[in-house]
C-alpha cells in the first residue's frame, strides 16, 4: 500500500509538474492479477484497483496503514465494477456485479474477495473510509433513466448516478457514484466548487486514448494535471476539482468527511478563477 501525504495549499502553488503528479495523481491502480491500494491522509481514505484473472483476489489486511486486524474492522468500502461482469464474495455470499454496478460493504466484514467473470475482464475500483457503526452489505445495479443536468451549449450536459448517499445505500460517511456525459459534452464540474468539509477522489475511465485536463488547487491559484484512462485524482477539501476531456469519458467520484449532504459545497464563479 502506497501512502500519500497531502501538501498544503501554499506548498501546492510551488510544486513542479512531476511533484504535483506524485502528490495528487494515482496512475498504477489496474494491473492484471493484482489488487493495488493507495492510502491518503486526506480523511484517511483508501483507493484501490482490482484486476482478478485466474485466481480470486481477497481484500488484504494492511496493519501498517489501518492498525487493525483486518481491513474492514473499523472501515466501510464502496466498489464499482468498471469492466466486464464479475462478482464479489462477502462472508461467503456471492454478489454478481455487472458493468457499472455498485456494492457497499459495511464495517466488520472480515472476508471480501474479488472474482473475475466468465467473459471479459472485470475491473473493480473501490474507496474505503473509516466507519463507526455497521450498515448492511447492499448492491445497486447501474441506474437507468437518470435525468441529465447541464447545458449542451456549454458542453457540460451530463448524468450523475448516485449510489451510496443519504437517500440511497446507507453508510457511515462514504458517498459514491459516477458521472457520464451526453454526446458532445466534455466539461465536468464547471463552474467548479470546493467543499471544505469533505475530501473527494475521482477516477477517470473509458477515455480510450483521449485525456482529461483536470483543474485543481485554490480558486485563485489553479493548477492542472493531464489525466489518462483509469487514473485517479486526490482532491483536498480546499481544492477545486473540474476537468475537460479531448473526447468522451466517465468518472467515479467518492467523498468522505463531516457529512453526506451532496449539495454541501462552496460554489466558485468562473470570473473568480485564476
Curated annotation (Swiss-Prot):
Catalytic activity: 5-dehydro-4-deoxy-D-glucuronate = 3-deoxy-D-glycero-2,5-hexodiulosonate
Cofactor(s) listed in the protein's UniProt record: Zn(2+)
Pathway where it operates: Glycan metabolism; pectin degradation; 2-dehydro-3-deoxy-D-gluconate from pectin: step 4/5
Superkingdom of origin: Bacteria
Enzyme Commission identifier(s): 5.3.1.17
GO BP terms, alphabetized: D-galacturonate catabolic process; D-glucuronate catabolic process; pectin catabolic process
GO MF annotation list: 4-deoxy-L-threo-5-hexosulose-uronate ketol-isomerase activity; zinc ion binding
Keywords attached to this entry: Isomerase, Metal-binding, Zinc
Cofactor note: Binds 1 zinc ion per subunit.
Positions of Zn(2+) binding: 193, 195, 200, 241
Family: Belongs to the KduI family.
NCBIfam families in the cross-refs: PRK00924.1
Function noted in UniProt: Catalyzes the isomerization of 5-dehydro-4-deoxy-D-glucuronate to 3-deoxy-D-glycero-2,5-hexodiulosonate.
Name of this protein: 4-deoxy-L-threo-5-hexosulose-uronate ketol-isomerase
Amino acid at each position: 500500500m502506497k501512502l500519500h501525504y497531502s501538501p498544503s495549499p501554499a506548498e501546492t502553488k510551488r510544486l513542479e509538474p512531476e511533484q504535483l503528479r506524485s502528490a495528487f495523481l494515482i496512475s498504477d491502480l489496474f494491473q492484471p492479477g493484482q489488487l493495488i491500494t493507495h492510502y491518503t491522509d486526506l480523511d484517511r481514505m483508501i483507493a484501490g484497483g482490482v484486476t482478478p484473472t485466474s485466481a480470486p483476489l481477497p481484500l488484504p489486511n494492511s496493519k501498517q496503514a489501518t492498525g487493525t486486524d483486518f481491513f474492514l474492522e473499523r472501515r466501510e468500502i464502496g466498489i464499482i465494477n468498471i469492466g466486464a461482469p464479475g462478482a464479489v464474495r462477502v462472508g461467503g455470499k456471492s454478489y454478481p456485479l455487472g458493468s457499472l454496478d455498485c456494492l457497499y460493504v459495511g464495517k466488520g466484514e472480515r472476508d471480501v474477495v474479488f472474482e473475475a467473470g466468465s467473459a471479459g475482464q472485470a475491473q473493480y475500483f473501490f474507496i474505503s473510509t473509516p466507519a463507526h457503526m455497521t450498515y448492511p452489505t447492499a448492491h445497486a445495479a447501474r441506474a437507468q433513466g437518470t435525468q441529465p443536468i447541464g447545458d449542451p451549449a456549454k458542453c457540460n450536459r451530463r448524468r450523475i448516478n448516485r449510489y451510496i448517499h443519504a437517500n440511497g445505500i446507507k453508510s457511515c460517511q462514504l458517498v459514491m457514484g459516477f458521472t457520464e456525459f451526453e454526446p458532445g459534452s466534455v466539461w465536468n464540474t464547471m463552474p467548479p466548487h470546493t467543499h471544505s468539509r469533505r475530501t473527494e477522489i475521482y477516477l477517470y475511465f473509458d477515455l480510450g486514448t483521449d485525456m482529461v485536463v483536470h483543474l485543481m488547487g485554490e480558486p485563485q491559484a489553479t493548477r492542472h494535471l493531464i489525466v489518462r484512462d483509469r487514473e485517479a485524482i486526490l482532491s483536498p477539501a480546499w481544492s477545486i476539482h473540474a476537468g475537460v476531456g479531448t473526447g468522451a469519458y466517465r468518472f467515479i467520484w467518492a467523498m468522505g468527511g463531516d457529512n453526506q449532504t451532496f449539495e454541501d459545497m462552496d460554489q466558485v464563479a468562473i470570473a473568480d478563477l485564476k
